[in-house]
A protein has these predicted regions:
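Residue-level detector of short coil/turn "hinge" positions at structural boundaries
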Residues: 14-16, 78, 104, 154, ...
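General beta-strand structural signal in soluble alpha/beta enzymes
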Residues: 37-39, 54-55, 78-81, 104-108, ...
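Short, hinge-like loop/turn segments at secondary-structure boundaries
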Residues: 33-36, 97-99, 122-125
Length: 178
């Protein structure tokens, strides 16, 4: 399982202590233990000791921001692939994480999950980088590659990307605009 793989690579045990989602009864690829399910994610912080929060709600404001903000204020490390949240509130949340002496990790929200931030931070730390040019957006890269390889239209490939989960089903604007 992925859990075991992570435990082997990191040498750390993973204990899922709480899960929250809009719909508890939605069909998923895994079972949710009803004892650790919270319909209101903010209540998790009142009743559980959490080391890391994984946020994947996908909104820039509202509950996404409130959950991440609450976690950071409670000295909980945060991992999020939420592009919209980081684009709009990244500076504020980074400062809050720094103030709380915890990590805010969001590399999966940048460049289609390519570890570009770590590469720039660690491997190119002595270089002065003024600009980065290129398409650093996984959805757009997929669509352009697929259009070229299959000779299908943009709309058809976008629908395919949405079915595969590469682009949001309702409004893929954020996925396409980076």
């Amino acid at each position: 399982t992925k859990k075991k793989e992570i435990e082997i690579k990191t040498g750390k045990k993973i204990h899922v202590v709480a899960i929250s989602a809009k719909n508890k009864n939605k069909k998923r690829q895994f079972k949710i233990d009803k004892k650790i399910f919270y319909s209101n994610p903010l209540k998790i912080f009142k009743s559980k000791k959490i080391d890391i929060l994984f946020e994947s709600i996908g909104l820039s404001d509202g509950i996404s921001k409130k959950v991440v903000e609450t976690a950071l204020k409670n000295k909980v490390n945060v991992i999020t692939p939420n592009k919209a949240l980081i684009a709009k509130h990244g500076d504020y949340l980074s400062k809050l994480a720094e103030k709380s002496k915890v990590n805010l990790e969001f590399e999966a929200s940048v460049a289609g999950g390519i570890p570009i931030l770590r590469t720039i931070k660690e491997s190119l730390a002595t270089n002065k980088i003024n600009k980065v040019y290129g398409i650093l957006n996984g959805t757009t890269n997929y669509i352009l590659s697929e259009m070229e390889n299959s000779n299908e239209t943009f709309d058809k490939v976008l629908q395919k990307a949405q079915k595969l989960g590469y682009a949001e089903p309702g409004n893929p604007k954020l996925d396409l605009n980076g």
